[in-house]
Amino acid sequence: ADPDPQVYINFKGEDKEKREAMKFLLGAFLTALMFMALVLITQFNSIYQALLVLSAIVFSTTGVLLGLLITAQPFGIVMVGLGIIALGGIVVNNNIVLIDTFNRMRKKGLNSIDAALETGRRRLRPVFLTAFTTVLGLMPMVLAMNIDFVSRNISFGAPSTQWWTQLASAIAGGLTFATLLTLVLTPCLLVM
């Protein structure tokens, strides 16, 4: 049955705080994207290359969702939002390195296909190792590991790790997915 039209329902408390946090994080994310776009356009003198870098951030959110799914973590607006924003900086850095190397190869006279192949060859190890060590470093948080150095005890699932597990899962999943995209998709799109 429908409630009486004179009845007014207003959600407060945690729901209101989540909405405010989501609004703030969305504003921060869009502002960061705008500033990144301005810096990238001036750095590369190319709107296409700047959009290519920024598209990696959007694509990496798929990896964030996959990371949460694999680790069976709930979607928490605050920690996942912070994870996406933090991930944006890492993904942008990897793509800037690739595009800068590609542009230097083009200035040396290589055609676009050879420049993309050489870029992939030169930057595979640094990009992969950076991502691998970051994901490996996040694994204790992803696994909700709690280490007590005094009693030499390792436990899993401590309440203090609840928030960090979502954040670490978001960054680890997104970075893994984004690294694969960076190493495969970015050079392909640069050739176009």
Which residues does each predicted region cover?
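Structured binding elements
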Residues: 163, 167-168
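Hydrophobic transmembrane alpha-helices and their membrane-interface caps
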Residues: 35-123, 128-148, 155, 173-177, ...
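Surface-exposed acidic, glycine/proline-enriched linker/cap segments
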Residues: 152-160
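Extracytoplasmic/periplasmic membrane-proximal domains and adjacent transmembrane bundles
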Residues: 1-32, 41-45, 72, 113-115
